[in-house]
């Protein structure tokens, strides 16, 4: 039985992973052309291994005109020559395997580039099989201005194509025509794409825009009609080809819909980003009130045993606040993005975390400690580990996609070319002379070294990824207390969202634990209950604690992970 359990844990590797997202083009340039490449990324694998991450999620690197940072693909079976070759990619995956790091890649199959050969053929020849790979209408549909993803930038979801003599559907930009994913031929092609990259060593895919991928599309479609069984088809294919491979879905949907994406028995998506918790986490940070975050945690608690949430703070897109009420959204705008140039699409904030928190080290640590201890698997963005900033002079979301800052060398050590693919941040407190890996490596008290320690500790607490959680009540709504139990082991995490000290009092109220100590995993600040089993802890402003329930020798007697 023990062997079976450990085999299951190995298969469900994503339960206790730490995922690191990066763009090849902005990580490290090895050949000096100003653009990051796979050879540069290979040179930094030892750095990533030292950081402690266990999986790398690569943003799109396939051939593309680059009008949407690679999310407009022209060839699903290649590597953009700017980044290298398929041989370089295989060398990269082998290097990751040698270091115990898995690779996830973006799977962008809701749409292609309008320069993709499929779309060009569909436009030229109405009898081509590719014509039915896209969505067409002879007349401009009445709902052409509904369902716009990028308000203020995008004006319609239908545009006229002269060569085709018809209107085509595009949920996103007009240069990204939607694939007709209801077409069995398109679904077969998606499986073929996944199989190709699995053969080259990837462990799964971050599927872009999942709700749109599985929706029925067409001029006559007036309401959302999701085809959830499509996800089961994808998942079964992965299981057949590579048993441990996963799909991490981008599905910003209501909590009431989550189980339809996971599947009642976890037979659809293995992982999803928890957008609901993410938005309410920032609301909690903005208002110093844990209650909205608690509500989001409870709302997203139901999920199959094999399913997992991806918990994140910031990603490559804007901080989407679309699930909040107008009043809640304004509270977050006021706290973290008060200027119009900081906001995007009327619903989001286009900033990195550090400048949002005004560079306050205490708040930055609090935020990452929270993310690391929320139910699920933490997903970091490149540069998070050194508190990189943003460049609001760059358009839309590019402001938070600037090159990685490695050193004080010209162009932050990213490239020797005089013209990097995007400008590095030079000025202000987040300029590369102040914020870079080399300087923080030398400083034992730097955020980088703190992040390495917190990642190492997170991997030593599998209860977060595997266990059941419960919220513990206390005397302060500014404080969040969350407890996990797994294999007869328990851990408790406490976070003070307030800028003032908080004396927090609480009782665990679990059988036989009224006298249990709370052993601090990060310092010697242990907590001992009084005669009634009540704990009293003084938290400093934005303070946090990681505790294990049990006596001081309990760490030596834990069940193996």
Predicted regions and their residues:
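Active-site and adjacent substrate-binding regions of carbohydrate-active enzymes
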Residues: 2-561
């Amino acid at each position: 039985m023990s062997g079976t359990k450990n085999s299951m844990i190995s298969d469900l590797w994503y339960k206790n992973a730490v995922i690191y997202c990066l763009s090849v083009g902005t990580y490290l340039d090895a050949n000096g052309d100003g653009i990051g490449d796979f050879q540069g990324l290979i040179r930094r694998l030892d750095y990533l291994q030292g950081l402690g991450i266990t999986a790398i999620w690569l943003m799109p690197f396939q051939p593309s005109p680059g009008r949407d940072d690679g999310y407009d693909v022209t060839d699903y079976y290649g590597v953009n020559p700017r980044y290298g070759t398929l041989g370089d990619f295989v060398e990269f995956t082998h290097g990751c395997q040698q270091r115990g790091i898995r690779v996830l890649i973006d799977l962008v199959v809701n749409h292609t580039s309008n320069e993709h050969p499929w779309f060009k053929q569909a436009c030229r020849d109405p009898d081509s099989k590719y014509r039915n790979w896209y969505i067409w209408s002879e007349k401009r549909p009445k709902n052409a201005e509904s369902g716009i993803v990028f308000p203020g930038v995008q004006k319609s979801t239908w545009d006229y194509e002269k060569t085709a003599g018809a209107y085509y559907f595009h949920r996103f930009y007009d240069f990204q025509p939607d694939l007709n994913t209801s077409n069995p031929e398109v679904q077969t092609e998606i499986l073929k794409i996944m199989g190709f990259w699995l053969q080259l060593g990837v462990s799964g895919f971050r599927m872009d825009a999942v709700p749109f991928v599985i929706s029925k599309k067409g001029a006559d479609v007036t309401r959302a009609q999701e085809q959830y069984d499509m996800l089961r088809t994808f998942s079964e294919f992965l299981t057949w080809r590579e048993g441990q491979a996963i799909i991490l879905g981008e599905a910003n949907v209501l909590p009431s819909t989550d189980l339809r994406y996971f599947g009642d028995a976890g037979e659809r998506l293995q992982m999803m980003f928890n957008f609901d918790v993410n938005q309410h986490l920032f609301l909690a940070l903005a208002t110093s009130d844990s209650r909205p975050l608690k509500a989001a945690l409870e709302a997203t608690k139901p999920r199959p045993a094999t399913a997992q949430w991806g918990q994140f703070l910031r990603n490559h897109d804007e901080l989407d606040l679309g699930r909040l009420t107008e009043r809640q959204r304004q509270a977050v705008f006021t706290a973290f993005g008060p200027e119009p140039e900081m906001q995007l699409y009327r619903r989001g904030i286009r900033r990195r975390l550090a400048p949002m928190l005004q560079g306050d080290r205490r708040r930055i640590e609090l935020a990452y400690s929270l993310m690391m201890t929320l139910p699920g698997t933490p997903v970091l963005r490149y540069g998070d580990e050194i508190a990189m900033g943003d460049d609001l002079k760059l358009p839309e979301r590019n402001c938070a996609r600037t090159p990685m800052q490695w050193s004080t060398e010209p162009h932050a050590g990213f490239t020797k070319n005089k013209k990097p693919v995007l400008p590095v941040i030079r000025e202000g407190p987040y300029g590369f002379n102040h914020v870079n890996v080399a300087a923080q490596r030398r400083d034992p008290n730097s955020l980088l070294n703190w992040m390495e320690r917190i990642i190492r500790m997170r991997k030593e607490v599998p209860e977060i990824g595997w266990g059941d959680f419960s919220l513990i009540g206390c005397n302060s709504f500014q404080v969040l207390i969350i407890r996990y139990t797994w294999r007869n082991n328990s851990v408790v995490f406490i976070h003070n969202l307030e800028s003032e000290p908080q004396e927090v009092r609480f009782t665990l109220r679990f059988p036989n634990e009224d006298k249990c100590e709370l052993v601090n995993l990060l310092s010697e600040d242990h907590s001992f209950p009084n005669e009634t089993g009540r704990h009293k802890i003084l938290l400093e402003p934005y303070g946090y604690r990681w505790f294990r329930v049990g006596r001081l020798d309990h760490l030596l007697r834990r069940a193996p992970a």
